[in-house]
C-alpha cells in the first residue's frame, strides 16, 4: 500500500490517504497537548508508544469480537487503518473518580465508582468538546439511536476487556476516551487507545502512568509512557 498526501493533522496524529480509498495511513506524533490545546509540549517517543500500545489494544478487541479500524502496523510510529467517517461523539468511560469528574461531582480523586459512568462529549475543538447527553445527540443528529445503543454496549465491553487484561500487569483503568466512526455503513471503534486517551494508575502505588503527568507537570512523562508499553509487551 502506498502513502499519499496528508489529509488531516490533529493534536496527536497525522492522517494520509493511500492508493486504496478504503484505508488511511496514520502517523503518531510526539506533540502533546492538554486542556483542549491550551497547554502544548513534546514527549519524546510518545508517538511510538501510542502507536504500539494502540495496536496491542486494537488486536485485543478484535480477538474478543469488537471490530476496530486497525489493519496493521507499518513501523514503530505508523499504522494502516480503515477509512472512517467519524461520529462526532466522544465516549468517556469512568471506573474511578479523576480529572474533571472530581470537580463536577465533588468527590475526591481515587473514589471507586459503584457503577461505571458513561459520558458523551461533542467532538468540536472550537467549542471545547462540551459534555452532552442523548437528547443533544438526537437533536444535533450526531448519531442514530441504534448507533448510540451499539456504541454504549461496545464501550462497556471494552471496559470489561481492558480491566481484565490490565489487572495482571498491575494497572488500574481509571477512565478512558473512545471514538467511533462509520466504514461502509458499519460502526467501528476508531482513534487510539493509549496513555494519551486513558488514565492508567499503578495498582500498588497509585502512580500515574498517563498524560496526567504532562497535564499536571508531574515529571517523568516519557518514563511513564514507556512503562505502560513495557508492561504490555515486555519492550523496554
UniProtKB/Swiss-Prot annotation:
It is an enzyme of class 6 (ligase). It catalyses: 5-amino-1-(5-phospho-D-ribosyl)imidazole-4-carboxylate + L-aspartate + ATP = (2S)-2-[5-amino-1-(5-phospho-beta-D-ribosyl)imidazole-4-carboxamido]succinate + ADP + phosphate + 2 H(+). Its EC number is 6.3.2.6. InterPro entries: SAICAR_synt/ADE2_N (IPR028923), SAICAR_synt_PurC (IPR033934), SAICAR_synth (IPR001636), SAICAR_synthetase (IPR050089), SAICAR_synthetase_CS (IPR018236). GO terms for biological process: 'de novo' IMP biosynthetic process; cobalamin biosynthetic process. Keywords: ATP-binding, Ligase, Nucleotide-binding, Purine biosynthesis. It holds the Pfam family SAICAR_synt. Pathway: Purine metabolism; IMP biosynthesis via de novo pathway; 5-amino-1-(5-phospho-D-ribosyl)imidazole-4-carboxamide from 5-amino-1-(5-phospho-D-ribosyl)imidazole-4-carboxylate: step 1/2. One of its GO terms (molecular function) is phosphoribosylaminoimidazolesuccinocarboxamide synthase activity. PANTHER family: MULTIFUNCTIONAL PROTEIN ADE2, SI:DKEY-6E2.2. Belongs to the SAICAR synthetase family. This is Phosphoribosylaminoimidazole-succinocarboxamide synthase. It comes from Desulforamulus reducens (strain ATCC BAA-1160 / DSM 100696 / MI-1).
Amino acid at each position: 500500500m502506498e502513502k499519499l498526501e496528508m489529509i488531516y493533522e490533529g493534536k496527536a496524529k497525522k492522517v494520509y490517504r493511500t492508493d486504496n480509498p478504503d484505508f488511511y495511513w496514520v502517523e503518531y506524533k510526539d506533540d502533546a497537548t492538554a486542556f483542549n490545546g491550551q497547554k502544548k509540549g513534546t514527549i519524546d517517543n510518545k508517538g511510538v508508544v501510542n502507536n504500539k500500545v494502540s495496536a496491542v489494544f486494537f488486536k485485543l478487541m478484535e480477538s474478543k469480537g469488537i471490530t476496530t479500524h486497525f489493519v496493521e502496523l507499518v513501523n514503530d510510529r505508523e499504522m494502516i487503518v480503515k477509512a472512517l467517517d467519524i461520529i462526532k461523539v466522544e465516549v468517556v468511560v469512568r471506573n474511578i473518580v479523576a480529572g474533571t469528574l472530581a470537580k463536577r461531582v465533588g468527590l475526591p480523586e481515587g473514589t471507586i465508582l459503584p457503577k461505571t459512568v458513561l459520558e458523551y462529549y461533542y467532538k468540536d475543538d472550537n467549542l471545547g468538546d462540551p459534555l452532552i447527553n442523548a437528547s443533544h445527540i438526537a437533536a444535533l443528529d450526531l448519531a442514530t439511536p441504534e448507533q448510540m445503543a451499539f456504541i454504549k454496549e461496545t464501550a462497556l465491553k471494552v471496559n470489561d476487556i481492558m480491566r481484565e487484561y490490565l489487572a495482571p500487569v498491575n494497572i488500574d483503568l481509571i477512565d478512558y476516551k473512545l471514538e467511533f466512526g462509520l466504514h461502509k455503513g458499519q460502526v467501528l471503534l476508531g482513534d487510539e487507545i493509549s496513555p494519551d486517551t486513558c488514565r492508567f494508575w499503578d495498582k500498588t502505588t497509585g502512580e500515574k502512568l498517563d498524560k496526567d503527568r504532562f497535564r499536571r507537570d508531574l515529571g517523568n512523562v516519557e518514563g511513564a509512557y514507556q512503562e505502560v508499553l513495557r508492561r504490555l509487551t515486555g519492550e523496554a
